[in-house]
Structure formats: C-alpha cells, structure tokens
C-alpha cells in the first residue's frame, strides 16, 4: 500500500486503499503519510484527515507514539488557530486534524486577498483520509479540492462503495469510492477480509444457522407467509413496544 501510494503520488494521481477493518490501517496510514512527506519533495505538507474528536485524540496519540523514534514531527491541531499556524509554518510537516477544523478554516477563517489565504491556498498538500467515506463527504471533498487545487487525496476504507452498492448523491457528486478518489475503477492496493483471515491478522467467522428443524426450504418459505406466522410476529412486536 505504501509503495502504491508513493508511485501514484509521483505521477500526480490520487486513489483509495481497501484494507479490511482490524488489519492495522492506522500503522499503514502513518507510514504512508510519513513516506509521502519524505519521498516527494514537491509536497509541502501531508494532512491525515479524520472525523470525530475522540478518534482525533486516539489517532494523534498513536501517530506520536509511532514518531518517537522517527525523523519527522507529528503536529496535532487542537484548535483552528493552531491549524492555521501549522499551515503557515514554512517547515514541511505531517499534520493530524479533523475535517471539521479544515472546513472551518477554509470557509470561515481565511479571508480572500490576505497573506494567510494566498499562502495556505497555494500549498501542495497530500491528504490521507482514514475511514474515507465517513470522514469526508463528496461535497466536503469537492469544496476542499476547489480551495486546495494542488492537492492529492488518498482514502483508506474497509468497506469501499462500488457501482452495485452506491449511494445516490446530489447532482454530479461522486457515488462510488473510485469516483470519489479515482484510480480507473480499482484500489491502489487491497487487503481483503479473506486475506486477513488467512494471515491470522483478524479472527475468522463462526457461522451458525438457526431455524426450524425438519422443514425443507420450500416449506419454510410457505409457512413464513401464512397468516398465522405474520400474526405471531405482529404480536411479538406489539408486546415489546
């Protein structure tokens, strides 16, 4: 995944990484965010973008623990003012922040025509987004891309959205993961649940089917639609409400 992101960034391409939940996405995303900053001189800063405040703290602490013996600093942004300060700093940094703070900075705090506005707008950034569908909506990503026109985007997800399970969006907003992060219909790298179970990176599933005994599937289907069964279900619902 790290190498795939590096190669894509060298070509100025964005993309998404499909890694199953529990397979170590946080460590992978840290290394990927770090390597983009270290290996691609044209990138001014890398931004690890997340959604919720509790996840912000959790991820910040994880990143800082990874960076203890590393050669780069991880800067967190507790406040929007801190985010602006980090963005204005001339040093190349890896920043951990929430999309809410980024949105407030872009839409409310930066004033067009000011030195802050022009400098931050001109930065070449690489965004790495954890849980990319939850953290950044299609509209939010479009708004941020319009402001940061020199940006690359890499989304991590354990549950990509494909054509067959896409969500309806307003207008021409992206509906699938590929449309949102773009890589010609396929992830930059994938590590599926099947591979993770095989590698014993995550626990497997124990499937146990519960149902009526001694009844064929055809009989079960007929019994399911009888008035007696439907009344029984209705009684259970009413008694529990």
Model region roles, listed by residue range:
Residues 1-241:
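RecA-like P-loop NTPase motor core of helicase/translocase proteins
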């Amino acid at each position: 995944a790290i190498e795939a992101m590096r190669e894509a960034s060298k070509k100025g391409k964005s993309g998404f990484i499909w890694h199953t939940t529990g397979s170590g996405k946080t460590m992978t995303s840290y290394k990927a965010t770090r390597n983009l900053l270290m290996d691609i001189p044209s990138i001014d800063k890398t931004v690890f973008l997340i959604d919720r405040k509790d996840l912000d703290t959790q991820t910040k602490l994880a990143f800082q623990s990874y960076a203890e013996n590393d050669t780069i600093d991880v800067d967190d942004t507790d406040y929007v003012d801190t985010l602006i300060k980090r963005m204005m700093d001339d040093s190349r940094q890896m920043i951990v922040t929430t999309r809410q703070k980024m949105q407030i900075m872009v839409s409310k705090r930066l004033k067009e025509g000011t030195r802050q506005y022009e400098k931050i707008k001109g930065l070449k950034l690489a965004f790495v987004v954890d849980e990319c569908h939850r953290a950044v909506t299609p509209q939010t990503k479009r708004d941020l891309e319009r402001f940061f026109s020199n940006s690359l985007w890499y989304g991590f997800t354990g549950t990509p959205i494909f054509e067959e399970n896409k969500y309806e969006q307003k207008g021409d907003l992206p509906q699938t993961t590929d449309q949102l992060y773009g890589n010609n219909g396929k992830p930059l790298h994938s590590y599926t649940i099947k591979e993770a179970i095989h590698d014993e990176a995550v626990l497997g599933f124990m499937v146990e089917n519960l149902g009526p005994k001694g009844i064929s599937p055809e009989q079960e289907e007929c019994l399911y639609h009888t008035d007696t069964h439907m009344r029984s279900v209705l009684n259970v619902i009413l008694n529990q409400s």
